[in-house]
């Protein structure tokens, strides 16, 4: 069961308490905001986590209107060291063509670090990655596919630095 840090207000509380749920007990945290949150709110939340020594992974970046409206804004988050996760179903088009287009642009520009399912457990929204893995391997290369699905997740578990995507 993966816990994620939801939004800046909750982040403020847990930052003060020093009790942030991390992935595999390391420094990486999954952070999720409301799709309606503004860019400054998201950027500030990520910055505060980084300043506290955490490595934020922005969950389903393609679903935030303020991010998906501009590759420059996504680039700003990427440039400040925020790790970017996109959902497999978004890549495959289940969330509309605009979300699909932006998710695929993140892949094309090598700005995504992870692909996930958004399945918070194995009962609801069951994980299904097979078609997405094949798609990414065909369209973006086997090496990048391995980074997204194997190498980078392994580095989170080991609490190791994740290299820039190339």
Task: Tell where the protein language model's regions lie, with residue ranges.
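Extended substrate/RNA-proximal surfaces in nucleic-acid metabolism proteins
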Residues: 1-85, 163
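Active-site environment of divalent metal-dependent phosphoester hydrolases
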Residues: 7, 63-67, 91-94, 120-124
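A general structural detector for well-ordered alpha-helical segments in enzyme core domains, enriched
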Residues: 45, 73-77, 102-106, 132-136
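Conserved, mostly hydrophobic/aromatic
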Residues: 60, 118, 153
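Aromatic-anchored helix/helix-loop segment that forms the rim or "lid"
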Residues: 83-86, 91-93
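Short loop-to-alpha-helix "cap/lid" segments that border enzyme active sites
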Residues: 96-102
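Short acidic/histidine-rich active-site segments
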Residues: 111-127
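Mid-to-C-terminal alpha-helical segments outside catalytic/metal-binding sites
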Residues: 129, 133-166
């Amino acid at each position: 069961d993966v816990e994620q840090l939801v939004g800046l207000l909750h982040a403020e509380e847990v930052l003060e308490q020093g009790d942030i749920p991390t992935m595999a007990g390391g420094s990486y945290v999954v952070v999720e905001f409301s799709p309606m949150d503004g860019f400054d709110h998201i950027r500030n939340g990520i910055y505060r986590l980084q300043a506290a020594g955490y490595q934020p992974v922005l969950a389903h970046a393609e679903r935030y209107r303020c991010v998906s409206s501009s590759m420059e804004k996504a680039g700003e988050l990427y440039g400040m060291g925020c790790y970017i996760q996109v959902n497999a179903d978004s890549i495959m088009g289940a969330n509309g063509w605009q979300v699909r287009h932006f998710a695929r642009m993140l892949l094309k520009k090598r700005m995504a670090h992870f692909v996930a399912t958004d399945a918070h457990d194995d009962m609801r929204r069951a994980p299904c990655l097979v078609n997405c893995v094949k798609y990414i391997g065909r369209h973006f290369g086997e090496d990048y596919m391995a980074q997204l699905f194997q190498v980078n997740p392994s580095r989170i578990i080991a609490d190791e630095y994740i290299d820039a995507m190339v």
